Amino acid sequence: MGVNPPFLCEGGGEVTVDLWQLVEEAVSPLGLDVLEVHFARGELLVRLERKDERPITVADLEEASRHIEAALDREDPIPGSYRLLVESPGPKRPLFTRRHFERFQGLKAKVPGPEGFTGRILRVEGEEVVFQVGDEERRLRIGTFRANLAEWPEEPR
């Protein structure tokens, strides 16, 4: 994929391991996927979803938090103190894989940037996502952009 999943590290000391991989190894056995890892100003934010695509529960997040804490304590990758936040993706969930766009087909997504737009996800064709933007279709190659869900489905997907 041309664009890595969202891992952001801003300011404060050097992080000595791949936090994405560390978190992924901690939560994958729990049936969870990592959507985002962001470290900034003493906070490590982790957003997760269930692999079975059912809604994530507070119990899922609590268990994931315990497993992530254990992995962080074992590896000690972040110098100094920090706060761990483990969350569900929420209403502005990131979309960046083929599976994400297929799962939320028919819903609106926001693509940020200078030429950004909000459009309905029509379909995935090959390596492209096709959006309906006004009266026209726009195609973007998966892995070259990021998007966020701009509306929430009536039923869990």
Curated annotation (Swiss-Prot):
Where is the protein situated, by its record's location annotation? Cytoplasm
What Pfam families does the annotation carry? DUF150_C, RimP_N
**Record-linked InterPro entries:** Ribosome_maturation_RimP, RimP_C, RimP_C_sf, RimP_N, RimP_N_sf
The record's GO CC annotations read: cytosol
GO BP annotation list? ribosomal small subunit assembly; translation
Keyword annotations for this protein, in alphabetical order, are: Cytoplasm, Ribosome biogenesis
Residues forming coiled coils: none
In terms of superkingdom, the source organism counts as: Bacteria
What family is it from?
Belongs to the RimP family.
Function recorded in the entry: Required for maturation of 30S ribosomal subunits.
Classification via HAMAP family: RimP (MF_01077)
UniProt-recorded name of the protein: Ribosome maturation factor RimP
